[in-house]
């Protein structure tokens, strides 16, 4: 696993270079030439900033705001501003984790700004737009920001991001999905617009079974899988099933409904009526807590 600091620098470097090449939209653009600059502090490795950032959609010579939504940006008021979009889930199944995801995103760009920004620019994320983890609302949220941002700092969800790819392609809009879908590794899927980071759900599924067989205090011969269809659950399940086939482990059952159709009672019912040696869930934090609580009430102490 890559150290988080190194991984963050790689993501920043890629996005900085892409922003240098993409100004977005059809509005008139100007280019301000900037010599490559190395910015370094005692707390961070050296970062070479991008030269020739284009002004246009989401990029302005005016300074960034000092705060967004009450959160400081650490922007330099003597520099221009690069604006990024935020498509988050504030009211849907991932509302519980939305604040932490957003805090991390904003914190990263605060750090970037505090170490010199990108050439003659600071970077800020605009106010997040609620998608409720719904593809159609995700598109509406994208439309609300597409003329105001140079790239997406975060697009939460795999099906949701796939749903807006056509529009992103029209805008030449790059983004960093909060999603580790294995399809992002293929240009035929992401059209070269996705800033990929981390390991894919499929690989994580393989590793999960491998780790469980080596580390858990049971002889795992049968397993159950639950997750969200068409989301990370399917990708995760495919990895687990592939590893199970190679290891001679039987997948006794799968419960993979669409995200908004996940039934906690049905999931717990499978655990009670079709017991297995280990369970491999890939659901949201709220659903996971409900499933674990329901299983405990039924007398189960699942290994998950």
Spans of model-derived segments:
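Bacterial signal peptide processing site
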Residues: 23-26
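Signal peptide-proximal N-terminal region
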Residues: 84, 103-125, 218, 245-249
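Extracytoplasmic ligand/sensor domains, especially the bilobed periplasmic-binding protein
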Residues: 69-70, 149-255, 303-304
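Extracytoplasmic "Venus flytrap"
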Residues: 64-78, 85-106, 128-135, 157, ...
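Beta-alpha junction/loop-to-helix N-cap segments that form part of ligand/metal-binding clefts
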Residues: 69, 96-103, 115-188, 197, ...
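C-terminal motif of bacterial Sec signal peptides marking the signal peptidase cleavage site
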Residues: 18-21
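Bacterial N-terminal signal peptides that target proteins for export
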Residues: 1-11
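Extracellular/periplasmic bilobed ligand-binding domains
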Residues: 171, 237-304
